[in-house]
Structures are given as C-alpha cells and as structure tokens.
Amino acid sequence: RFRQMESGLPEEYQDEQELEKQRNIHDQLITKGMEVITDSYLDVPKFKCKDMNIPFVGKSLEGRNWIELVRDINESNYDLVVMGVLGLGAIKDSSIGTVTERVIRRIQTDTLIVKHIPDLHGDQEGSGKIVVAVDGSGHSFGGLKTGIEIAKLTGRPLEIISSFDPYFHYAMFNSLTGVLSKEASKVFKFEQQEKLHEDIIDKGLAKIYQAHLEISKNIAKEEGLDCTIRLLDGKVFEKVLQYAREERPHLLILGRIGVHSAPDMDIGGNTENLLRLVPCNVMLSSRVFKPKVDMVADESIEWTSEASERLQKIPGFVRPMATTAILRYALERGHSMITSGVITEACENILPAGAMQAMNMIGDK
C-alpha cells in the first residue's frame, strides 16, 4: 500500500535513493510496530489472568488475521473461542465484524460472541438469565448441556425456549391460490392439503416443540437444576429476537446449526439472524448431545392400540430391549406415532430374515 502511494509523495521524496530509504524505514516501523501492538493486546488478558490466578498462554500470530485465527483454532484443542462481535473498524450501523463472521463460519468449536460490554453500554436492566433455545437438534441439546453448566457456575437462572411457526402454511397456500390452475389444484388436492395443515400440522407442531421443552426440563432436572420453559409461536428468529429484546438475558445459547440443517452447513439461518440482531451475548454451540431414547419417547411418541397389543405379545424377557429398538427406529425416522406397520418395519430392519417368525416376537398381525 505504501508503494502504491509513492507517486503522491512530495518532490523531495521522489529521488530513488530517498524512496528506498523511506521504504526500509516504513517496513521496519510496520514490522516492529505490529509486534509491539500485538504484544500490548496480549498484555491485557495476561495481567487479568495473573490477578485471578488463571494460567495464561499468549500467541502472536503473523499473517492475515481471520486466516491465522481459523488455522490456529482448527489445529488446537480449544474448548471455547471468545470473540467480540465488532472490531476496531466498527461503525454505527455495523452488526458483526468481518473477521468474527469469517472465523465462526470456518470453525467447529463452541464460540462465545461478546455483544454487551457494561463499561461501554452501561448496566442495562435485564433478566440476567442464561437462555437456551432448543429445536430438537443435537446441537441445541448440546447447547442446553453447556447452559446447565454455566447456570450452575454463575448461579444465574436458566430458561429454555422453543419456537415454532404455525403461520407459514397460510402464507404458502395464499400464494398458491393465484398460481395453481384448476387442473393443478386437483392434482395437488389443494383443499384437502390446506385442511390437513389446519387440522393436524398446526397442533402437531405445537406438540413437537412443547416436547422439546419438556425433554430439556427433564435433562436439567437430572443435572440437579430447576429451570423455566417457554414456548413461542411465530417466525422463529423474529420471536426469539423479540423475546431477547424484552427479557435482556445475560447469555443466549444457540445451536450452530438447527434440526433442518445439512451436517456440513456452516451456520443455521435462524442462528445467523439472531447473532446479528439480539442485544445480548451469544454462544454458538457446536457440542452435540442426544437425550436418552426413553426420555424422548416419553414426551414425543405415542402408540396405537394395535401396536400396544402387539408389543405385549413380545416375551417379557426381551420386551424392554425390543421396545427400545422400536422407539429408536421410530425416532430416527421422525415418527411421533408408532403403528403396527412401524413395528413390522422396525423388526424387519433390526432382525435377520426369518428371525421374527422364529422368535415369535411381534405376535399376530
């Protein structure tokens, strides 16, 4: 950059020898200056850690900032990465710094993004809660486990929230009204589909997300911690954002990716929107935790009467094992109701050919 600006230097600096001299001075100042600045930055946490008897290791990385941070994080076995949401280049309308955004997209380590600094923003009134948002994904339950640990260590109250959107299909069907021809409506079975959503899917969604909350509450209870739960309805990131603005929690914990994300997704859409907009500190959880099968089943799985009858025909000494296997099969495939057909599918999938008949495990159909 300095060399690009050389043509604009005063005339007395245009001599070749003088230019070379200035280049050397500039290079030395920049190299040494950057080292001094970096070491000065590290001195701040170094002395804070010393005062609190916390071991400290400083690293001065040379190179493009976000590239070197990503490389170091991915090569190291860190439990947690802490970054400010904004850097030195922040302006009034900045929502997230480019370095922070580039780093979080390229790492798979739990990351705390600091957004509220009392010395800068003042002590704002708020709930002081540790809040965990769950959607049934392993990442959100992993965040819950971390939230429980933090709540225990800090003595702060824990609240678990979940949000579902029962209104999306209304917008979808309204948009289709003026698009589908009569023939297409018949093929799509427009009226039947709309009624199905109104009668079943809306109520089913509420039940699913309430189950996530009950499961989360049970997990916290097993850890010896009381918590509160809250179900929100509406556009997910909008409702969680509204909640965060009203409650002003101390920390909001989000799964890095959600229940509908592909495994190789860098960050989920709701998490990304909330990271930019919520006024509180945010933790992105890369930790994955799966609740016990029986705990999930108790809150989210029901059996038809026929399926229950078939289950009772399984010999008692293997019934618990068979029940767990059937539940796991159903959960992995997203079933909330176990029918006789699901039992048959599960046993065919689990047992070798002919074993069902030989062991007489599933009774008469």
Locations of the language-model features?
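Protein-protein interaction modules outside structured cores
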Residues: 203-207, 241-242, 257, 261-265, ...
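Structural beta-alpha unit
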Residues: 2-7, 17-81, 191, 197-252
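Glycine-centered tight-turn and secondary-structure capping sites
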Residues: 96-97, 255, 267-268
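Conserved RecA-like P-loop NTPase ATPase core
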Residues: 311
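Flexible internal linker/loop segments at domain or repeat junctions
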Residues: 174-200
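Intrinsically disordered or low-complexity boundary/linker segments at protein termini
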Residues: 1-3, 74, 79-91, 95-154, ...
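Conserved C-terminal helix/linker of AAA+ ATPases
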Residues: 329-350, 357-363
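The conserved phosphate-sensing helix
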Residues: 316-324, 337-340, 356
